Every structure is written in C-alpha cells, then in structure tokens.
Amino acid sequence: MAANYSSTSTRREHVKVKTSSQPGFLERLSETSGGMFVGLMAFLLSFYLIFTNEGRALKTATSLAEGLSLVVSPDSIHSVAPENEGRLVHIIGALRTSKLLSDPNYGVHLPAVKLRRHVEMYQWVETEESREYTEDGQVKKETRYSYNTEWRSEIINSKNFDREIGHKNPSAMAVESFMATAPFVQIGRFFLSSGLIDKVDNFKSLSLSKLEDPHVDIIRRGDFFYHSENPKYPEVGDLRVSFSYAGLSGDDPDLGPAHVVTVIARQRGDQLVPFSTKSGDTLLLLHHGDFSAEEVFHRELRSNSMKTWGLRAAGWMAMFMGLNLMTRILYTLVDWFPVFRDLVNIGLKAFAFCVATSLTLLTVAAGWLFYRPLWALLIAGLALVPILVARTRVPAKKLE
C-alpha cells in the first residue's frame, strides 16, 4: 500500500467582523437592477446554448448513422489492404510504440504512449467561511479564515491571503509537472494520427516499489519521490513526485499485457486519420478495449444522448436563473411585508419554472424543425401545456 504522509501541524484561524449600515430601499433597488442585467444575459445565452445543442446532437447522430453504414473491418491489421484506401475502417489491436518513454531524473523508463510526471508542493491553504446577521440595526459580516498545510499541484499565492505573515508559500516549484508522448504509435501496420494519440487517456498510477532513490536528496516512500528531509513530517516548500502512464506498449512482466484499443477512422495509406461525413462532421473514434463496430457506435450514440440532455438541463437552468434575477425587482418592492413577500417569492419562482420549461421546449422544437418537422410540432404542443395550466389556475385563485 502506498504511503501518503501528511503534516501534524496545528490548524490556524482568525475571525474578522465588518459592520455596515442596513441598505435603504433605493440602494437595494439599485442592486436588484444590476442583477436584472446579469439575468438578461443568462436568459439570452440559454437560447443560444439550447438551440446550438440540438443542431450539434442531430449532426452527430446523423454522422454516426452514416459511419455505421459505411464502416468495414479489414481481415488483418498486419497488412494494409489497398481496397480500403479512403474508407472508414474498424481496427482492433494492441498499442505499439517505437521507443521507451523515460524521466532520467528519477530513473523511470517504460514502454507506453504517454508518461506523466505529477508534482505537488506542501503549501499553506486558506479557507474562509462567512455569515451575515443583523444586530442593533446594523448588518454584520463575520468571516472566519482558516490556514492548513496540504499537498497541492498548483502554486498557491500567499500574497492573496488575508494574513500572509506566518503562512508564506514559495513562488515556484523546483521541479515541474510534465507529460511525455510517444511520437509514433501503431496498431499492427497502422500508425495512429495525433488526434487518436490524444484520445489515449487511460492513465494508471505507476508503482515505484522496484525503483531506488535516484539522488541523495530524494527519498522514495510508497509511490512517491519526496524532496524532503523527513517525508513523514514535511515542511512548507517540500515536493513529492508521482508518475502515471497511459497506453502500455507491449507486454511487461510488472505492468501487464499491452493495452488493446478499438479504432474507427479513415485509412490513408498506413495511417488512421479523420473521416469526413456528408453532414460535415468528422469521425475519429478510439475506445479502450475490444469492441465490435456496432458496439462502438452504440456507445457513441449513448454518449451523444447523455451530452445532449446535460446541455439541455444546463440551458434550462440558465433560463430559470435568468428569469429569477430579472423578476427579483418585484420581490424587492414588497419585501417590507413579510407574509406578502413570501407569497410573491413563491409565485415568481413558479412563474420562472413554467416559462423556462415552455421556452426550453420551444427552443428544442426550433432546433429540430429543420431535421424532424413532425417531432418538432409534437414538442411545440407539449410546450404549451405549462402555460395553459398556469392560465387556468389564475381564475380559480380569483374566485377564492
């Protein structure tokens, strides 16, 4: 098991309290006006996000359907078939590189597509917690600043701390993170293009148990190299280095068998390059493992569906928040009356929910209109339901 040492230093903290007068009606109205502008921007941005997402989703789905109808699987990956020149091919095989990747500073050498060195520094980290409360007619903001030491991969600028004295971090690391990538990667006789090499991202931690300490001032503990006098009790500024790799090339007695991938791309000589579809999209697919062509396209369609629904939800949320901010001024006008204020708040949120849902569905329908007119009309009909429900509830409330 890898050792993961940490400091036993005492947590430090201090509290600051800022006092300000309670904002008047005009001041709060001015703040709300600024929020209205932000809300308007979010509202308009949501239309762009939802509409373009539908175009992207349908374009991707069309390209995948086209690719599935055209893809062919060569008889062998150890020979280049001339009859497949320019065609979309389905290749399965183990990755192979031309040379070892290494970091001579730490004595690390292995056959892989990518080798990543990850460097962390022991630093002071500031966290703050704030709360506001009213006391004697004044608004008070209490902020609690806490300082603790942690291993972080990014430089934390202690000059931005509320209290830098006693919590100063170094301004740079003596050793930096980096990633080495094999220039040539093959599957059988075929060379992967740079776009496919970028997709090899199945990083695994590299065990350092069989490596020796590379230098006198570097200590190996578990799967880390420590630039520290005592890794068990590190000091601010100490470093620790770990390694990970992706795309193991060739069988290794310690790391296991070579990594197998499934690629769908265009054959250009002995290279696998992007394939352009009739819809204007490109197909350049790499999946980790052994999959049939049908399985690869099914996985891509599922991924496209999840991305589409995720962006739809993000667009709806942006629209809902935008409407909330734009109607916030109505809440400000009545916030002197507690009971009425709460009723208005509930009503405004219900209004924003209904309008955001309706406009989202209408925007989705508009995005589909050019591709699937019948589906667009159905969604447009569903979009009117929340509005009709809201309108029918208004007379009922008036009768009450």
UniProtKB/Swiss-Prot annotation:
Domain of life: Eukaryota
GO CC, one annotated term: Golgi apparatus
Keywords assigned by UniProt, alphabetized: Acetylation, Cardiomyopathy, Cell membrane, Deafness, Disease variant, Emery-Dreifuss muscular dystrophy, Endoplasmic reticulum, Immunity, Innate immunity, Membrane, Neuropathy, Non-syndromic deafness, Nucleus, Transmembrane, Transmembrane helix
Protein's membrane topology: Multi-pass membrane protein
Residues exposed to the Nuclear side: 2-31, 335-345, 390-400
Tissue: Highest expression in placenta. Also found at lower levels in heart, ovary, spleen, small intestine, thymus, prostate and testis.
GO molecular function per UniProt: identical protein binding
Cellular localisation: Endoplasmic reticulum membrane; Nucleus inner membrane; Cell membrane
Disease: Arrhythmogenic right ventricular dysplasia, familial, 5: A congenital heart disease characterized by infiltration of adipose and fibrous tissue into the right ventricle and loss of myocardial cells, resulting in ventricular and supraventricular arrhythmias. Emery-Dreifuss muscular dystrophy 7, autosomal dominant: A form of Emery-Dreifuss muscular dystrophy, a degenerative myopathy characterized by weakness and atrophy of muscle without involvement of the nervous system, early contractures of the elbows, Achilles tendons and spine, and cardiomyopathy associated with cardiac conduction defects.
Subunit-level organization: Can form oligomers through the transmembrane domains. Interacts with EMD; the interaction retains EMD at the inner nuclear membrane. Interacts with LMNA and LMNB2. Interacts with SUN2. Interacts with RNF26; this interaction is important to modulate innate immune signaling through the cGAS-STING pathway. Interacts with CARD10. Interacts with gap junctions proteins GJB2/Cx26 and GJB4/Cx30.
PANTHER family per the UniProt record, alphabetical: PTHR13416, TRANSMEMBRANE PROTEIN 43
Record function comment: May have an important role in maintaining nuclear envelope structure by organizing protein complexes at the inner nuclear membrane. Required for retaining emerin at the inner nuclear membrane. Plays a role in the modulation of innate immune signaling through the cGAS-STING pathway by interacting with RNF26. In addition, functions as a critical signaling component in mediating NF-kappa-B activation by acting downstream of EGFR and upstream of CARD10.
Entry protein name: Transmembrane protein 43
Organism encoding this protein: Homo sapiens (Human)
Gene name in the database record: TMEM43
